[in-house]
Amino acid sequence: MKHCLVVDDSRVIRKVSRHIVEGFGFEVSEAENGLDALDRCRERMPDLILLDWNMPIMSGIEFIVALREMDGGRGPKVVFCTTEHDVAHVREGIAAGADEYVMKPFDHETLQFKLTRIGLA
């Protein structure tokens, strides 16, 4: 079974994201900040990471840079899920190593479209 790590400081967003991704057949784990997410990736590298941009302790950008430097860290597909919508943020996220970008709030259909584009749906 494919594994997804949902990284967001909002418990509500993590739960909604979990529900959507489980509907796609993923096993899901959660982290509330980038540092916790790196620890989870060391334990088990996921196939997919849904990543918030603005988080305490370690931002999404800081996380993805650290992830891509880890052993096996180039493997997971990363989708930024954020309220940051200007073109500069999108470019920064993709340049840092994200595979796709989705605006919050998102629904089942939007996420499915994005996952299809990166080969995971």
Question: Can you describe what each PLM-predicted range is?
Answer:
Residues E62, H85-E100, T110-F113, R117:
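Alpha4 helix (beta4-alpha4-beta5 surface) of REC/receiver domains from two-component response regulators
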Residues P56-I57, D86, P105:
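The feature encodes the CheY-like receiver
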Residues R11-S29, I118:
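Two-component/phosphorelay signaling modules centered on CheY-like receiver
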Residues A31-L35, V90, H108:
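Conserved Asp/Asn-Gly motif in the active-site loop of CheY-like receiver
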Residues N33-D36, S59-V65:
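Acidic catalytic/metal-coordinating carboxylates
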Residues R44-L50:
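Active-site beta3 strand of CheY-like receiver
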Residues I49, Y101-V102:
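Two-component signal transduction core modules
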